Amino acid sequence: MTAPHPLLTLTDEVADALRDGAPVVALESTIISHGMPYPQNVAMATEVEGIIRAAGAVPATIAVLEGRPRIGLTADDLELLASDEDVAKVSVRDLPFVVARRSHGATTVAATMRLAALAGIRVFVTGGLGGVHRGAQQSFDESADLTELGSTDVAVISAGVKSILDIGLTLERLETLGVPVLAYGSDEFPSFYSRSSGHAAPMRVDSAAEVAAVMAAKWDLGIAGGVVVANPIPEADEIPADEIGGIIEQALADMAARGIHGNEATPYLLGRIVEITGGASLTANIALVRANARLGASIAREYAGLR
């Protein structure tokens, strides 16, 4: 394996697993600090780590604490991220600033991918991907998740693109960036809260072994960049697309009226949707992260077996 970058701090559990070639699954921390309310966020983070361990892999939640990129966190670290309102939301552009200032930062999908790759981790589980925002033709608002997927060798397991975004344009950008987009067990690309999006899946896989084979083939060919694995939310937990669509439109209108934009947009929208749905969207969010954690652990095991 490639030695982790010297500026990273790994827990003993993660370091031992990477040294031994055991399966490791990276987890982001923005979902803890900015994606869910306290205390559900810390409970979810702890539960997801437990799911990954029970499935035979080692979880590595990633964040920046006191300016040090951390690969794997303690229970106290998770509590800090979940409850401290001063924790910054950190994408790739922000990493140098937060590290230099020795601040705390919760990593987005993009920053988590970059730090996972520096640690030698190839599988990463999250809730939903960032992408092209609605109205991007005027705002040019696109998530750095996309450019990171185009350049960083990590497979990202999610429930699809966050449904507050323009899913069709996001799929177009992923195609342009040369990123394989695999829908797990479905011919349709999922849309986070819903199993359907109205967009056909670019590619379909039906097992963790298939995903691992695609990962190995891509990187063995020397093709840089990530792999998107879109795992539809369990049917019993989904909010139907036609139902969530109107709720998202209301949340978008509320955001526009408040003049919220940039990296504050997604946290506001997710929080507003929780309010409008009376908590149903939060329940769905937790359910899909659980499902993604199980699948991610299986993929990590299969990929470790190929190495």
From Swiss-Prot:
Q: Which GO terms describe its biological process?
A: nucleobase catabolic process
For this protein, what is the EC number? 4.2.1.70
Cofactor(s) listed = Mn(2+)
Q: How is the cofactor bound?
A: Binds 1 Mn(2+) ion per subunit.
**Annotated Gene Ontology MF terms?**
hydrolase activity, acting on glycosyl bonds; metal ion binding; pseudouridylate synthase activity
The record's section on Pfam families has: Indigoidine_A
- Catalytic activity as recorded in UniProt: D-ribose 5-phosphate + uracil = psi-UMP + H2O
Residues that, per the record, bind Mn(2+): D141
Q: Does the keyword Thylakoid apply?
A: no
Residues that, per the record, bind substrate: K89, V109, S143, A144, D145
**Which residues does the entry assign to the active site, renumbered to this chain?**
E28, K162
Task: Alphabetically list the UniProt keywords.
Answer: Glycosidase, Hydrolase, Lyase, Manganese, Metal-binding
| UniProt-listed InterPro entries | Indigdn_synthA-like, PsuG
Q: Which domain of life is it from?
A: Bacteria
A GO cellular component annotation here is: cytoplasm
Q: Which residue windows are transmembrane per the record?
A: none
**Family according to the record:** Belongs to the pseudouridine-5'-phosphate glycosidase family.
Question: What is the protein's quaternary organization?
Answer: Homotrimer.
What does the protein in this record do? Catalyzes the reversible cleavage of pseudouridine 5'-phosphate (PsiMP) to ribose 5-phosphate and uracil. Functions biologically in the cleavage direction, as part of a pseudouridine degradation pathway.
Q: What is this protein called?
A: Pseudouridine-5'-phosphate glycosidase
Q: Give the organism, scientific name.
A: Nocardioides sp. (strain ATCC BAA-499 / JS614)
Its taxonomic placement starts with: Bacteria, Bacillati, Actinomycetota, Actinomycetes, Propionibacteriales
Q: Give the gene name.
A: psuG
